[in-house]
Swiss-Prot record:
It comes from the Eukaryota. Residues 1-21 form the signal peptide. This is Guanylate cyclase activator 2B. GO terms for cellular component: extracellular region. Disulfide bonds join C63-C76, C96-C104, C99-C107.
Length: 107
């Protein structure tokens, strides 16, 4: 394999890896890290904007938001939606849970 072919193979592998994204699996749900970041943004907006808040006794307020990412919407059907969203936000901010940091044990 020549140097240019090797270089092309490395570039293709890097592109494939970045296209896959980072997924979080929790209690049977698989969501993208970017979706969890969007969830946090939506919740922050709802907290700062009282007119966006709806009174949802059974569902977290964010479940009523049409901007909620598609991969998070099935969680709203769960009785554990609020605790699942909380756990996903916690996981998304923990580098060892996501195995971003190679120094983390168990990664």
């Amino acid at each position: 394999m020549s140097g240019s072919q090797l270089w092309a193979a490395v570039v293709v592998l890097l592109l494939l890896q970045s296209a896959q994204g980072v997924y979080i699996k929790y209690h049977g749900f698989q969501v993208q890290l970017e979706s969890v970041k969007k969830l946090s943004e939506l919740e922050e907006k709802q907290m700062s904007s009282p007119q966006l808040r709806k009174s949802g006794l059974l569902l977290p307020d964010v479940c009523h938001n049409p901007a909620l990412p598609l991969d998070l919407q099935p969680i709203c059907a769960s009785q554990e939606a609020a605790s699942t969203f909380k756990a996903l936000r916690t996981i998304a901010t923990d580098e060892c849970e996501l195995c971003i940091n190679v120094a983390c044990t168990g990664c």
